[in-house]
């Protein structure tokens, strides 16, 4: 087996609980629209804006992986329909994105990331538009690869290929960690990476799927796993 030389980490629901973050971000956007663009708020509910994003993604399949583009374009369409210019949509998206990056890491994450980063290079690998630097965790990472920059979302092999290009190491020497059975585990396995399933909820692994190489319950479990793989004390 190739020696372990790097770890890639999914972000949402791996380093922080994402649903509350998205709820707060949507609430922040709604409050801003009500104050700064009341005609959009009057014409479009949050559910309406969600449907508009789905329409944008369906109409732009080559860019549907770029969640920032999809949301901004949906806001542009809403702004135009309500008599506002595109610049307002850009400001609205900035409000959302700021709140989107106001995350609360799981309790063990900051300290454990620091210890892991002292042992191996860490890379962020995410389909979303959260940023580890804006989220306050960037100092632990060598680099971040996201779907927008890679031109594809997990489990597409192109995003993993981009990660390997950035890390400049063979696929078999990278351990990818994430919570999604398809995007993270199946995608990483198909690209030749080792896989660790982040299972914080104790959910049984889907019986119809090939299992991950490893299963962990939190980042401290990853730290112990890395210690074993490096042949060092936990």
Which ranges hold each PLM region?
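Asp-based, Mg2+/Mn2+-dependent phosphohydrolase catalytic module
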Residues: 1-7, 19-20, 84-87, 110, ...
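N-terminal helical cap/lid subdomain that shapes the substrate entry/recognition surface
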Residues: 2-107
């Amino acid at each position: 087996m190739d020696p372990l030389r790097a770890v890639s980490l999914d972000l949402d629901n791996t380093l922080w609980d994402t649903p509350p973050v998205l709820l707060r971000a949507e609430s922040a956007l709604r409050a801003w629209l009500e104050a700064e663009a009341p005609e959009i708020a009057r014409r479009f509910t949050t559910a309406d804006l969600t449907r508009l994003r789905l329409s944008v993604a369906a109409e732009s399949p080559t860019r549907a992986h770029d969640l920032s583009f999809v949301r901004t374009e949906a806001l542009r369409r809403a702004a135009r329909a309500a008599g506002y210019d595109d610049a307002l949509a850009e400001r609205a998206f900035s409000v959302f994105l700021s709140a989107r990056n106001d995350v609360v890491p799981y309790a063990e994450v900051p300290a454990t990331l620091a210890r892991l980063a002292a042992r191996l290079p860490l890379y962020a690998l995410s389909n979303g538009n959260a940023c580890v630097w804006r989220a306050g965790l960037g100092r632990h990472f060598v680099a971040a690869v996201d779907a927008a920059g890679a031109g594809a979302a997990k489990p597409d092999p192109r995003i993993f290929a981009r990660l390997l290009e950035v890390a400049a190491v063979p696929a078999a020497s990278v351990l990818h960690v994430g919570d999604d059975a398809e995007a993270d585990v199946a995608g990483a396995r198909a690209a030749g990476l080792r896989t660790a399933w982040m299972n914080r909820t104790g959910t049984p692994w889907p019986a119809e799927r090939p299992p991950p190489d490893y299963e962990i319950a939190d980042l401290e479990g990853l730290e112990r796993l890395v210690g074993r793989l490096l042949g060092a004390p936990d």
